[in-house]
Amino acid sequence: FPFTERGTKAEDKQYTFRVEPSYVNALLDMGVDVASLANNHALDFGPDALLDTFTTLDEAKIPYVGAGATKERAEEAIFVEAGGRKVGVLSASRVIPVVEWNIENCQPGLFCTYDSTRLVQRIKEIESQCDYVVVFVHWGLEKKTYPEEYQRNLAKQYIDAGADLVVGNHSHVPQGIEYYNGVPIVYCLGNYIFNPNMMDTYALKVVWDVEGDTNLQVIPVDTREYLTGELKGDEAQAFYDYLEGISFGVNIDENGIVSYK
């Protein structure tokens, strides 16, 4: 959502959102290192609201990806240090309500990936600048458990270009996990906090081992009463079983550790 108190609501859009800039403190309290802005709500209240979002995040010293005042900035990667290694983060959207939101058509705007060419190129450009490349993509259909075929095809193109992890969002419900050439694709994490009618979701712990392999641990959570809490015991196991069932060729053990068959 844009951090703003101004702007004009987008026409012919059922759901539009914005939040007071002071709520950026919630991201700070959570320890957010990078914010992804490539989604179908970033321009709900127009370009001024998106510019306010950039300002709010800059003042909070939270780097952002997936949007910018210029094409160069929207396509820019953010590099973060984790465990003594350098991780490059890119973000793009495959879901926007009108073509004018695409940075190719307006500024400010969003980095989009309806055509994979530009994101593939950016992955190749930053691969040599970091140890790992993580790609976040806003894609798919809302409330759909399984990814669309285009999601699977795009993810494989990103991995062929050099991505070490692909993580998606947008469907509002969890989607499964798949490995391609040993690289994990997490199609959708669901909602971290949202409508209480969509309670099942999960967080993801990522560990790169000394061989450079990407290891995943699923942390199952629910969002009852608009609060996110970790599932334990039988509830956690039920979620592991469910997620394994909607995934592609993976096992999830009793601790949430993911492996491919």
Where are these regions (language model features)?
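Acidic, metal/ion-coordinating pockets
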Residues: 1-261
